[in-house]
Amino acid sequence: MTSRDSASSEITPAVLLRAYACGIFPMAESADDPTLFWVEPELRGVIPLGGFRVASRLARTVRSDGFRVTVNTAFKATIAGCAAPQAGREDTWINKRIRDLYSGLFELGHCHSVEAWQGDDLVGGLYGVSLGRAFFGESMFHTARDASKVALVHLVARLIHGGFELLDTQYVTEHLKNFGAVEIPRRRYTALLDKALAGEPGDFLKLSPGEAIPGARALEIIASRQ
């Protein structure tokens, strides 16, 4: 289900948080389209944290620590990377309005990024929204092989360690299926979301602020949930 906002409506970071609490999120038709529309899928993509899968080759890459992984150190560069065209993804739904709104959520502590570096070059990463014990993954990018996958592994370890219960991917792609993503009906999703929003919120920075932990430790945390 989609619903377009009027040109005069004002979507603020506070409005955005209320929308996420209701299971709704905004998108744009393209990076050049200034308008947004609200989305509430009939089938929602989630990755069960206890069922997150890491292929053997990727696990070796994670353990090698070939990428320097950081958290919340290059948010604007990460969202810009997600908005940039890539092979197989010539256009994106991330327009300037989206970038500004989520930068506002970042300033409020409700949006986070995980970045993967080679030297001084940002070569991959992801960002998403944290609310209660739910994390809503928004987008990821990479310019080096496996960079965004390594960032995702570190994200999941952080969510598990921080007491999160729900990793919402919004939709399921063939790529995300490799990590255990599944589609669930809206009613089931709403029940999971309500549970994740009740009680004490998750602590995204409990694992470590700034620099991420070694890859081997991230894999240990993930294995402890399975």
Curated annotation (Swiss-Prot):
SUPFAM superfamilies: Acyl-CoA N-acyltransferases (Nat). Keywords: Acyltransferase, Cytoplasm, Transferase. It is an enzyme of class 2 (transferase). It is found in: Cytoplasm. One of its GO terms (biological process) is protein catabolic process. GO terms for cellular component: cytoplasm. The keyword 4Fe-4S does not apply. It catalyses: N-terminal L-lysyl-[protein] + L-leucyl-tRNA(Leu) = N-terminal L-leucyl-L-lysyl-[protein] + tRNA(Leu) + H(+); N-terminal L-arginyl-[protein] + L-leucyl-tRNA(Leu) = N-terminal L-leucyl-L-arginyl-[protein] + tRNA(Leu) + H(+); L-phenylalanyl-tRNA(Phe) + an N-terminal L-alpha-aminoacyl-[protein] = an N-terminal L-phenylalanyl-L-alpha-aminoacyl-[protein] + tRNA(Phe). Gene3D superfamilies: Leucyl/phenylalanyl-tRNA-protein transferase, C-terminal domain, Leucyl/phenylalanyl-tRNA-protein transferase, N-terminal domain. The keyword Transferase applies. It comes from the Bacteria. Disulfide bonds: none annotated. Its main location: cytoplasm. Its EC number is 2.3.2.6. GO terms for molecular function: leucyl-tRNA--protein transferase activity. Belongs to the L/F-transferase family. NCBIfam families: aat. Functions in the N-end rule pathway of protein degradation where it conjugates Leu, Phe and, less efficiently, Met from aminoacyl-tRNAs to the N-termini of proteins containing an N-terminal arginine or lysine. HAMAP family: Leu_Phe_trans. This is Leucyl/phenylalanyl-tRNA--protein transferase. It comes from Bradyrhizobium diazoefficiens (strain JCM 10833 / BCRC 13528 / IAM 13628 / NBRC 14792 / USDA 110).
